[in-house]
Amino acid sequence: MKVIIAGAGKVGTMLTRKLLAEGYEVVLIDNNQQVLETCTERYDVMAVRGNCASMETLEEANVKKADLLIAVAGGDEYNLLCCMTAHGINPNIHTIARIRTPEYGEQIYKMRDVFALSMAVNPERQAALEIERILKYPGFLRRDTFARGRAEIVELKIREDSKLCNVAIKDMNSITKSKVLVCAVRRDGVVSAPDGNYILKEGDRIFVTATSKELTGMLKNIGVITHKVKRVMICGGGKLGFYLAQQLSKGDIDVHLIEQDMNRCIELSNHLPNVSVVCGDASNQMFLESEGIEKCDAVVAMTRFDEMNMIISLYAQNYNVDQVITKVDHTENSRIQDILGLGSVVCPKELCSNQIVRYVRAMESTTGAALSIHSFADGQMEALEFRVDEETLHCGEPLKALNLRKNALIACISHGKLPEIPDGESTFNVGDILVVVANGDVVLHTLNDIFV
C-alpha cells in the first residue's frame, strides 16, 4: 500500500517511522529541504519538496497511484486543500487531515464529503479526552478499555510504601485478592514482559490487565485511596487547555485555567464562562501558591514547552497534589518521567499518530486482522484486539500448550459478554475476542501471527 504524508513535522516524521516499520511504501512531502534531507538520511523514504496542496507537487509524488494521503502540514485550511486536491486527481484515494481549530470541529464533521475527507484528526481534542479519562479514574496513571469496556489495561507506579513493592508477580494476586495479569513492566525506561518470578521494585511502572470490577478491588486491597476529583488547575491556555477546560467544566469540577497572555485570557473567558481564567506565569512557584495549588486534587501542565511542564509538575508533586499530568510534545521527553518521578504523561502527537496508524491498518484489514490497537509504555508495547474466527489456529486448546512468539501474550479472552483474565488452562473458541499484548517491534497483521 502506498501512503503519501504531507508535512514532515513531528507527527509526519513519527508516522513515517511507524508506517515504514510495518512495510508500507511512504512518500514524504515538505517545502523545507533541510527537514527532508534529515528524514531521508534516517529513513528509507522517497521525499518530494514543494507545496503540499499544489497539484504539481502531488502529481510529482504520484498521488494518482497512492492509496492514502495524510495531511499533517501547517494550518487546517492548508491540510483541507491538500486533501481536496489529492481527491480531485485521484477520486479513489483515502484522505486524512489534521484539523485543530475548535471552531471547525462540528463543521468538518458535517461537511466531510464536501472536503473529500475519510477522517479528520485533532491531537489536542484527543489528548483532552485522554486526560479527562485519567482524571475520572484516580489511582491509575493510564487506563485503556477493551472488549466493549469490560476489560482494561491500566498503568500503576510502585511506590516505596506500596504493598506490591518487593513482591514477585506470581504472588501478586494473593495480595490484591483480585485476578489480574501483569503484561509489562517499565524499569529505568526499559520495558519488558516479565515472568512470574519477576520482583517488583520501587519506581517500577506496571501495566496490568483485568476486568473493571477486579481493578476496583485491586486498588482497595493494595491501599490506594481514591476520591473524586473536584478541583483541577490547568496550566496553559492553548488549544489543549481550552479543550480540556471545556470538557471538565461540563461536570461539577471546579476548573482553574492559568494562561500568561492577557489577550488569550480574555478570549478564553469569553468562550469558557464556567471556568476561572487567571492571567499569570504558571512556572512561578509563588504564583502557584497564591492560586491555591495545594488545595487542588489535580494539576495538568500543558504549556507550549516540555521543560516548563515538567517544572510545574514537580512543583505540584512537592505540594502533594494527588494527580499530576504532564503534556509533552517530544516523545523522547516522556521517558524522563522515570528519572523525575512524574505521574501521568500525555503526548498529543503520539495519540494522533496512533489513531492514524489504526486507520491505515484497518484499510488493509483481512480475516483475523486486529479490531483495535492501542500503544502504551511510550509506544514500546501494543495491545491488539482480535476476533477468533474459523481460520484461527489452536481453538479449544489450553494456552499452556501453545507456542507464542517471543514478547507476545494473550492478556484477556472475552467469551461473549464475559471477560476472562486467562491462565494456562484457559481456551478460546470461534466468536471470542482476544486481547494480545506484544512488543511494539512485533508486527501482528492477523491473529495467527502470534503463534510460532
Where are these regions (language model features)?
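Cytosolic regulatory regions of ion transport systems
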Residues: 1-452
